[in-house]
Regions:
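Extracellular/cell-surface secretome signature
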Residues: 1-38
Length: 38
C-alpha cells in the first residue's frame, strides 16, 4: 500500500520516479498523481 491512499489517491502500479515529496512520496503515472509504495 501507499500513504497517499489515505487521502484518496491511487498507488503507483509500477515503480516510477519520485517527483515530489511532502508527507507522502509522489510519482506520476498515466498523467495523474500516484503514491509510491512504502
Amino acid at each position: 500500500s501507499c500513504g497517499a491512499a489515505a487521502i484518496g489517491y491511487p498507488c503507483c502500479e509500477n515503480t516510477c520516479t519520485e517527483v515530489y515529496t511532502d508527507e507522502y512520496r509522489w510519482g506520476v503515472e498515466n498523467n495523474d498523481w500516484c503514491g509510491l509504495k512504502d
